[in-house]
């Protein structure tokens, strides 16, 4: 649960089965593991006022991803591209490359350095978006930062793939786990 500490989580809020305000389709709360009371307010800080007739009413909150779904989609796209590069590399190196052999990846896979640099830029953009949502850097970005840093290293020297192929694949797997973890928002 601490994995998404600081990242807003979204809830669809219904009263008696109806969404009283458009904003309640994906109302954001800042995740915190502790119990607390929040006043539901608009962007202007004014509390929402809901007229209720005398009697019993049901208020429900349903987990929804809201704006976070766009980030997840972007990370999934990056994972797909990273896997495509991995498959191209192992066609040449095999899954257990000799770290001392020169596979001449720069010439056999031209443009790979540029692809890796572009994926690094995409991850940087995602990291910046997450920081903007959370207001601070946190645990949620660590996996993304690790992958981005490795991409920066490899984009400058694709020949290093033979030395870091296992960690590259592990970092891709970690991104997949990240997607799974952030998709499951706690209640």
Question: What do the PLM-derived regions correspond to, one by one?
Answer:
Residues 1-186:
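Extracytoplasmic
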